[in-house]
């Protein structure tokens, strides 16, 4: 076995990319500071129940675990910094005021998120706690776009969805947890036949609504189409109203709407979004609203935010030159 080989999907950052990555990190942190965000630096490891309780449970399969030699308790290497920032907001800052927090640091994944993608992303992000209004979502979206521009990333398209649409339909259908999860997987796979099978016993209006979700993808015309094709449930109407407001406020941004986009369904509670550049199949930045993120720590505060991987930004920024 060759001693210098690294594990699969784990790599060094070499010159000149290392300086480019560091320049982007500094530019983003300076931008966050200018916008009033406070920097926090959580630890690399924590007790597993802190990182994987509640909404953080979606990260379980991605998380490396080990036994603490001092306490004998199970610990975990963080796979995402957001649950840590939620803990800091809920337990350590201890105020009901709006908190604007930012962070950066390495995270570790047991599996890669995609072909040739690193299992050690260098995560950077910003979050707003304590503001349930759409203004906070707009602030976060604008900050993310400004951050991408500061890193030299051009040709950005935003894909936007709202998990409240699917959640409202699923509640109206009265699914048990297992069926709801199966339908979620079918929608993510765009498997129309599986969606038809799983919704076969529902009233026709709900069957048609679930079948329509994968087709509701495109420009702002999708929002009007959704109002026509989906049941007139209050939660669905509220979600679509939010998306219309975002569309009006982000008039100069290339937007695509995807009402079957349920990434982080167990984690997010409202708007979800991802930024793409031409020629790249995976997102270079992503985020959304996750109002229940602090419940396990005793304070379920409204929250919205985004994160990026500096490794991916270096590649995307280079491609824009």
From Swiss-Prot:
Gene3D superfamilies: Bira Bifunctional Protein, Domain 2 (3.30.930.10). GO terms for cellular component: cytoplasm. InterPro entries: aa-tRNA-synth_II/BPL/LPL, HisRS-like_core, HisRS/HisZ, HisZ. Pfam families: tRNA-synt_His (PF13393). Disulfide bonds: none annotated. One of its GO terms (biological process) is L-histidine biosynthetic process. Its main location: cytoplasm. Keywords: Amino-acid biosynthesis, Cytoplasm, Histidine biosynthesis. GO terms for molecular function: histidine-tRNA ligase activity. Pathway: Amino-acid biosynthesis; L-histidine biosynthesis; L-histidine from 5-phospho-alpha-D-ribose 1-diphosphate: step 1/9. Signal peptide: none annotated. It is found in: Cytoplasm. SUPFAM superfamilies: Class II aaRS and biotin synthetases (SSF55681). Required for the first step of histidine biosynthesis. May allow the feedback regulation of ATP phosphoribosyltransferase activity by histidine. Heteromultimer composed of HisG and HisZ subunits. Belongs to the class-II aminoacyl-tRNA synthetase family. HisZ subfamily. PANTHER family: HISTIDINE--TRNA LIGASE, MITOCHONDRIAL-RELATED, HISTIDYL-TRNA SYNTHETASE. This function is generally fulfilled by the C-terminal part of HisG, which is missing in some bacteria such as this one. This is ATP phosphoribosyltransferase regulatory subunit.
């Amino acid at each position: 076995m060759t001693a210098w080989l690294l594990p699969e999907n784990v790599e060094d950052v070499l010159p000149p990319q290392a300086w480019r990555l560091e320049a982007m990190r500094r530019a983003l942190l300076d931008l966050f500071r200018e916008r009033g965000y406070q920097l926090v630096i959580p630890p690399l490891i924590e007790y597993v129940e802190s990182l994987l309780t509640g909404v953080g449970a979606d990260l379980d399969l991605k998380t490396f675990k080990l036994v603490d030699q001092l306490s004998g308790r199970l610990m975990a290497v963080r796979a995402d910094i957001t649950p840590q920032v939620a803990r800091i907001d809920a337990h350590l800052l201890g105020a009901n005021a709006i908190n604007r927090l930012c962070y950066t640091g390495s995270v570790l994944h047991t599996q890669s998120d995609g072909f040739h993608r690193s299992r050690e992303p260098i995560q950077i992000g910003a979050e707003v706690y304590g503001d349930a209004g759409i203004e906070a979502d707009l602030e976060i979206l604008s900050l993310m776009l400004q951050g991408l521009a500061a890193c030299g990333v051009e040709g950005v398209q935003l894909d936007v969805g709202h998990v409240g649409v699917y959640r409202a339909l699923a509640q109206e259908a009265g699914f048990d947890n297992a069926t709801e999860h199966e339908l979620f997987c079918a929608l993510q796979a765009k498997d129309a036949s599986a969606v038809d099978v799983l919704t076969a016993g529902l009233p026709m209006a709900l069957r048609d609504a679930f079948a329509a979700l994968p087709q509701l993808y495109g420009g702002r015309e999708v929002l009007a189409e959704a109002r026509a094709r989906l049941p007139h449930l209050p939660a669905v109407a509220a979600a679509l109203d939010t998306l219309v407001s975002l569309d009006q406020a982000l008039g100069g941004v290339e937007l695509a709407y995807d009402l079957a986009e349920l990434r982080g369904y167990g984690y997010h509670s409202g708007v979800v979004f991802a930024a793409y550049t031409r020629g790249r199949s995976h997102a270079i930045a992503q985020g959304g609203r996750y109002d229940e993120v602090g419940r396990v720590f005793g304070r379920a505060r409204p929250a919205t935010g985004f994160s990026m991987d500096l490794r991916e930004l270096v590649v995307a920024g280079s491609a824009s030159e």
